Amino acid sequence: MKEEKYMKKTAAVLAAAAALTMSVYASPQTEFTKGQWEINAGMWNTKAKTRTYKDNSAWNFNGGVTYGLTDKAAAQFQYYGLNSDDTDGRSHELNLLYSVHPQVAVYTGYNHITMSDFPIGVFGAEKRENDIAQLGIIARQPINEVLDLYAKGALGSKNTSIWEAGVNFALDENIDLNAGYRYLNTEGSRNKNVSYQGWLAGVSYRFGGGSDGKAVYSENDIDYSALENKGHKKEESMV
């Protein structure tokens, strides 16, 4: 009887570990594989707002590509449209990411933000461009075998801050669906910032990097709590 319980417990933990192995590569990535590519694309329903001006939202394309330089670092290009109902804009990011934990990555990079078609009285000009140096962090928390919560945040020059949080659903080990809310705030003039915010959703696809997909962390580095509890419940129902 004891051997049977031990085998059930071992099977539950192994199943959890296998599921998390798939989960750690979920988008947005906090762990990388050398030579692996990730392509992501989606839509962002964003609106523009300043202290004295507010515009209705419009749907924008967002997308990017990430490439694993090593098993700990990656290079990334990311694009976000910043069009609202009456204004135009876009954001181009170039980032270097580094995994400090299977569920946490930090990054630094350059962000070029263009804002145009604002009424002249808002910024004193119709068009504004910001060149931004930024530092950020990405964190994820597995909920079960296929569902993660994620959060991203960055601070940069020109009084810039970027925040995003949402959920990620893994269709398989290479394809994810995600949805969340994104907020971008940056300098429009010396005494007036502009913010872009709204709901977004997208899909990501990973390929390349070999077939082993081995992580460079030990099992002790990974938070198994959400998956272990599920395994224990299954064990109790079987006894």
What is each PLM-predicted segment?
Residues 46, 50, 83-89, 108-132, ...:
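Outer-membrane beta-barrel translocator/channel fold
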Residues 67, 98, 139-141, 155, ...:
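Residue-level signature of outer-membrane beta-barrel architecture
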Residues 25-83, 133, 142:
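Short glycine/proline- and aromatic-enriched beta-strand/turn motifs that initiate or cap beta-hairpins
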Residues 72-152, 157:
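Gram-negative (and chloroplast) outer-membrane scaffold detector with strong preference
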Residues 98, 135, 169, 195-239:
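Outer-membrane beta-barrel "beta-signal"
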Residues 59-63, 90-94, 133-137, 161-165, ...:
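Hydrophobic, lipid-facing positions within transmembrane beta-strands of outer-membrane proteins
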